[in-house]
């Protein structure tokens, strides 16, 4: 668990680590088991049970073949809102297409877009929410907007004294880091942080 202070506001960020079984020798290939944060329900559920929960999720937010929203609802978790990144909650929007606020047809939960005119949850969006859970697969490329959406979600949670739980998913390109660090004058939504 990481605890960060931001202007006197304490936020807790829980990164549920994945377990990767390493090979015993370079010449021997063994099966690796990856357990994502969302699959560790025994750790997640006690942190969100009896709380009003908002989720920032998309089509990659699955536990097995079941979406995290559906999994949490099965456990009677009070999911009150869904925040949608680029491509939308169900992944049906094209790259660069504005995502609109809506109601999810399956669950009837309100979806608030964080891709379009609005990039950051407002105080009103977080009203009556106790904890926000972030679970989105990223590919580790700076220009992917999911890390920018997480950046602004972190700010909003800190500013509104809301707990944020970040569920870890392994980066498929995590072994390779390359490129210059972003210069501040080029900062934008497709490059919000000074990373390679």
Where are these regions (language model features)?
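Bacterial Sec-dependent N-terminal signal peptides
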Residues: 1-31
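A short helix->loop->beta-strand "cap" motif at the edges of active sites that frequently abuts
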Residues: 77, 159-163
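Short internal beta-strands
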Residues: 80-88
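Glycine-rich, charge-decorated loop segments at or immediately adjacent to ligand/cofactor-binding or catalytic sites
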Residues: 91-96, 165-187
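Glycine-rich oxoanion-binding loops at beta->alpha junctions
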Residues: 99-129, 141
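Glycine/threonine-rich flexible loop motifs
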Residues: 138-150
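Acidic, His- and aromatic-enriched active-site or binding-groove loops in soluble protein domains
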Residues: 184-196
